[in-house]
Amino acid sequence: MPKYVFVTGGVVSSVGKGITTAAIGRLLKSRGLRVALMKLDPYLNVDPGTMSPYQHGEVFVTEDGAETDLDLGHYERFTDENLSRASNVTTGQVYSAVIAKERRGDYLGGTVQVIPHITNEIKARIRQVAELHRPDVIVVEVGGTVGDIEGQPFLEAIRQMRREEGRRNVLYIHVTFLPYIASTGEVKTKPTQHSVKELRAIGIQPDVIICRTDHPVGDDVRAKVALFGDVDEDAVILLPTAETIYEVPLMLERAGLGRYVMEHLGWDDRDPDLADWERMVERLKSPRRRLRIALVGKYVELHDAYLSVVEALRHAGLAHDVAVEIVWVNSTAERSEIEAALRHVNGIVVPGGFGPRGVEGKMLAARYARERGIPYLGLCYGLHMAVIEFARNVLGLCGANSTEIDPETPHPVIDLMPDQRGVEMGGTMRLGRYPCQLVPGTKAALAYGESLVYERHRHRWEVNNAYREAFEAAGFVVSGQSPDGRYVEIMELHDHPWFVGVQFHPEFKSRPNRPHPLFVAFIGVAKHVLREGEQRPLPLAEPVAMPAADD
């Protein structure tokens, strides 16, 4: 029977519960335990698949094709474990399931209520992870903040879990924030006291309180939190802001959290195997040089919209002992602004996306990289932008486009597959893990060092095979495809240092100690392209003609 660790948050949102949950998973795995992690999201959406990145950040795709919360990306990167759709539960999923059961008559005509029906469904989904993954321990993050009305059923469900599973099999960890008052030079504990008080009013007594802080905190603060929170002093963990998120497991271990969790759950503590992790963090904090990589997208104001891409670039930089500095380039900006940003970068990444807004800037970036020999990595939509730009400016296909952008284009170089036509959004995309057969001798094959790989997808539109021969004749070749030859998965330029576009999302599979080979190869070329500080002359490229359009 598995044991459970529940992580809640108080005082403010975005306090760091996701990183804390991932770090706890790392600490327990380093002690030889089989670990599973999951996120309970209180919002009413079924999943974040159709939510705006401005609202939610990136959508993280699991191996089995679930569109999930970005925190699952942290979980996978920290624990190096592939999660499943069962690892992300939303209020929308829970209510949909309960209502469907009521319609089928599963409740035998009874009155359907939040307690017990909604809470029972939540508990069943938590236990489903235990059945699927057979872990020793499940670490569960409860989204939102204590006091949010939509989170109440989830808190009630985890309260009941301790009663049903036994006190020694359930641990509650509460993550709070200690605000700093500059005028008095004090760190205040009162918000944490009230947050714990509210949690206790629900019936949950936290076993551990983790206090996030941006300023040094003394032992007197720890003692005060322990007194008002009714926990042991060594169960109050002071967690200052880290230089890198990957340092958090080491900070929590030094604070004694790993030992405390093991002892509370009735296990003998073991020495954690964190040597590789410590070396990785040390290298992250002391790189030999810096690279500037342009990330060209339309949601750059919210960096979380491209979280996995940024982390994958940093992982690849670690493999080459360089620090990757992201140059955020808004693809909706004026051409002159985009050009100015691209003058002094070592490489360009155009990440995934949807819709027509900002495509002009993305294609300008693709053309600049192609014409100037600058390393380019196009991810999903980034491949589409490179294909359209090449079709127009090299193949001479006037008006070439994607039918996603222009349904009436005379040259649909990017198009829906026939079986996708007429299907509405929401659960209709090509999602999850699919095989890709690599062409021997290509840059992609050399990067992977394998002939068959599996990658995660999230898209509806594909490269149109009707134009494949024309592209290959001009040097833009297919270097990876589905084993049946139906789908183009990777394209690359023959006569270019590194110009590769992929239909999938390799960033979802990158880990700090196991960076993705495509990102490693990209950074490996980029670090030889441009000396630090050097600038290229303007103009960079002629503008790409695109019709004005909005999302």
Swiss-Prot record:
Catalytic activity entry: UTP + L-glutamine + ATP + H2O = CTP + L-glutamate + ADP + phosphate + 2 H(+); L-glutamine + H2O = L-glutamate + NH4(+); UTP + NH4(+) + ATP = CTP + ADP + phosphate + 2 H(+)
Claim: Glycosyltransferase is one of the keywords in the record: no
Enzyme class: ligase
Keywords carried by this UniProt record: ATP-binding, Glutamine amidotransferase, Ligase, Magnesium, Metal-binding, Nucleotide-binding, Pyrimidine biosynthesis
Superkingdom in the source lineage: Bacteria
Domain Glutamine amidotransferase type-1: 292-532
GO cellular component: cytosol
EC assignment: 6.3.4.2
Activity regulation as described: Allosterically activated by GTP, when glutamine is the substrate; GTP has no effect on the reaction when ammonia is the substrate. The allosteric effector GTP functions by stabilizing the protein conformation that binds the tetrahedral intermediate(s) formed during glutamine hydrolysis. Inhibited by the product CTP, via allosteric rather than competitive inhibition.
Binding sites annotated in the UniProt record for Mg(2+): D71, E141
Gene3D superfamilies, per database record: 3.40.50.880, P-loop containing nucleotide triphosphate hydrolases
Binding site for CTP: S13, D148, I149, E150, K188, T189, K190, P191, T192, Q193, K224
Binding annotation for UTP: S13, K188, T189, K190, P191, T192, Q193, K224
Cross-referenced InterPro entries: Class_I_gatase-like, CTP_synthase, CTP_synthase_N, GATASE, GATase1_CTP_Synthase, P-loop_NTPase
UniProt key word Nucleotide-binding: yes
Residues annotated to bind L-glutamine: Y54, G353, Y381, G382, L383, H384, E404, R460
Residue positions binding ATP: S14, V15, G16, K17, G18, I19, D71
Region of interest (Amidoligase domain), residue spans: 1-267
SUPFAM superfamilies per record: Class I glutamine amidotransferase-like, P-loop containing nucleoside triphosphate hydrolases
Active site: C380, H505, E507
Name of this protein: CTP synthase
Species name: Thermomicrobium roseum (strain ATCC 27502 / DSM 5159 / P-2)
Gene: pyrG
